[in-house]
Amino acid sequence: MNYTDIFLADLDRETPVSRRVLERVPDGHFEWKPHEKSMQLGYLAMMVATMPEWLGMVVGMDELDIAPKDGPKFDPPPLKTSADLVQALDAAAKKGKAALQGTNDAHLAKPWKLLSGGRVIQETPRHVQIRDGVLSHWVHHRGQLTVYLKLLGAKIPSIYGPSGDEKAG
């Protein structure tokens, strides 16, 4: 099995899980955050909805500067409802899947750089960046999102087995 097959299987498994979580994001609470230093619910949910698209950046670009000195700052997409989030996830997963289907192990072994303000903060083979910087990072933020949802009283869907909210009895 090659990297692409593994990552495609991960994407196919994790996308429906993320969809179930995003469907539970309560409209009207997107500016809420559990702590003053935490990110807002809407921003965190937007990340969970759009992170699969990052696969295309890792496959198609040699580097990414997340805070370019003279370049544009990140402008998050205007996602205002759980329906917007689910639609964004479906589009991002489709783009991520296409990027993975268009690459191979030789390309994924090539180096990829993450920069901030022109300074290299990480340089790894693309397959490592996909695993750590995209897929595991995505799952991490989805986990954070479930905590936010629980604090808001939402029922948590099953992730890798039944949740306490979905258990019978």
PLM regions with names:
Residues 1-2, 48:
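Short N-terminal signal/transit or membrane-insertion segments
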Residues 3-8, 79-86, 131-135:
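Active-site rim elements
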Residues 8-23, 29-73, 114-169:
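Short, contiguous alpha-helical
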Residues 57-58, 64-104:
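Helix-adjacent hinge/juxtasegments
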Residues 106-114:
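Active-site-proximal loop and beta-strand segments within enzyme catalytic domains
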